[in-house]
Amino acid sequence: MFEEMILEKVRKEAERIAEEQGLEIFDVQYRRESRGWVLRIIIDNPVGYVSVRDCELFSREMERFLDREDFIEHSYTLEVSSPGLDRPLRGPRDYVRFTGKLAKIVTKDGKTFIGRIESFVDGTITISDEKRKYEINIDDVKRANLEVEF
């Protein structure tokens, strides 16, 4: 089965399982790596953080589906994880959800901003550091992620 077809079938079932468990799918990847084929499913909790138990329960259900359907022709490793503490920010919903959190935003023109997300309104992200506030149009963002705080 082609990789795109595998991804489509896995994503559909992953979304069903995630919805049942009150989770969301952040990403699904299927690719060959140095140790062989890896099916990586990254889950998210829309109202908090992903626990080890969340990963365990999701993984069990996904394994049942994969064993039952048996549509992946070669051996692979299933990995289920969270987006991580330094998770990428993907779109308006994330900027609203993580208001108050420390983030790093790199714009398409190469500027880097590190500060707390203050708000997201009408396509504009407001982020501030100790010295000043910055307003960044979401269309100008090349990449963004949360910064780990200690």
UniProtKB/Swiss-Prot annotation:
It holds the Pfam family RimP_N. It is found in: Cytoplasm. The keyword Coiled coil does not apply. GO terms for biological process: ribosomal small subunit assembly; translation. It comes from the Bacteria. HAMAP family: RimP. Required for maturation of 30S ribosomal subunits. PANTHER family: RIBOSOME MATURATION FACTOR RIMP (PTHR33867:SF1). This is Ribosome maturation factor RimP. It comes from Thermotoga maritima (strain ATCC 43589 / DSM 3109 / JCM 10099 / NBRC 100826 / MSB8). The gene is rimP.
